């Protein structure tokens, strides 16, 4: 188990991207020694950055090994295919060919800091929450979500592209957040997270930390049943010198 834990930890990022004009926040906490959640920041050859949040079905050694394969294969496909949707389509084909009896939900945002465009590709995951600087909230790419990865080998994934204006935020998360249970066996729910993100915070870090604190307060003295992962990306508000 320690080996699987070490393998998994090796595939999680040790630092956040240093992209001028952007802030990042991430939180990862497995429910047990080895979790099935995965997130990553992948610098692409053309200056863009891919942000991935995924949830491998299951826990334990097999899930950790599958996550290792997912991580390596995602990096390979993104390095060799510039189109995010095509890269995920190829990633799915490769994972489906493994014929392992598990699948993975994944959402990816490819951020271009030159154009401030964010291209979202969704494979059966919760859509990111997008909060505009004005406080409006939506879930881009929800209607374009495809099947989870590794179920069928001939799925074509569709991209959704939005422009991040100054002050805009994207929040990506796994179902350990919205399905967190309180003592009455009630789920935290996406609506609570939406409301919290919509209210905003002084900084991206504060938003991330207050979101996790709210989920933890909901769980109370109960048990965290599932891995929890939250990743936030924010375009800074431009200040005039």
Which residues fall in each region the model found?
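C-terminal catalytic subdomain
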Residues: 160-172, 177-241
């Amino acid at each position: 188990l320690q080996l699987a834990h070490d393998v998994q930890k090796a595939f999680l990022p040790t630092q956040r991207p240093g992209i001028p004009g952007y802030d990042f926040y991430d939180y990862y906490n497995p429910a047990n020694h080895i979790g099935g959640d995965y997130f990553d920041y992948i610098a692409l050859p053309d200056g863009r950055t891919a942000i991935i949040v995924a949830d491998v079905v299951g826990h334990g050694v097999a899930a950790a090994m599958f996550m290792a394969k997912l991580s390596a294969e995602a990096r390979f496909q993104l390095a060799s295919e510039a189109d995010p949707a095509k890269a995920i389509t190829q990633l799915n084909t490769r994972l489906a060919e493994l014929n392992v009896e598990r699948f993975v939900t994944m959402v990816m945002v490819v951020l271009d800091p030159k154009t401030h465009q964010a291209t979202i590709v969704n494979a059966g995951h919760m859509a990111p929450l997008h909060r505009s600087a004005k406080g409006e909230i939506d879930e881009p790419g929800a209607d374009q979500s495809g099947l989870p990865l590794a179920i069928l080998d001939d799925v074509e994934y569709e991209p959704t592209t939005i422009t991040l204006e100054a002050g805009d935020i994207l929040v990506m998360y796994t179902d350990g957040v919205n399905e967190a249970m309180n003592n009455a066996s009630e789920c935290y729910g996406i609506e609570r997270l939406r409301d919290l993100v919509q209210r905003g915070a002084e900084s991206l870090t504060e938003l991330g930390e207050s979101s996790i604190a709210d989920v933890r307060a909901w769980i109370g003295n109960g048990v965290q049943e599932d891995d929890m992962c939250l990743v936030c990306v924010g375009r800074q508000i431009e200040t005039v010198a």
